[in-house]
Amino acid sequence: FLIKKNNAELISKIKNEVNGAIFPEENAKYSDPTFITALATRLNLTISIDNGIMHMVGLADNPMIVLFGPTDSEKFAPKYSNIKILDSKKIYNTEDISKISEKDVLDLL
């Protein structure tokens, strides 16, 4: 999981719910955009929300599923060939990203 270190509560929740969850930045001596982008080149697939980390990972041009809620997917989605978009506004007519289900994501795999 690539999550900003200041999201301690979310990291703790994921560790409790996902057996064997890995957070590479916890063990790194540094963390910056080049580190995230370099790690991304090692990934087979990324599932992300619309955020800064997603844009850094997108530079690796690996397959990616990006979830959008209130932000405009037409404007902010990366323009790479391997990107699949799930936009809650288009699917469920709401800005509530939590309406996107696990099934929605799994259907794109």
Residue ranges: model-predicted function:
Residues 1-73:
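Donor-binding and catalytic core of enzymes assembling or modifying cell-surface/extracellular glycoconjugates
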Residues 55-109:
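Nucleotide-sugar donor-binding patch of glycosyltransferase catalytic domains
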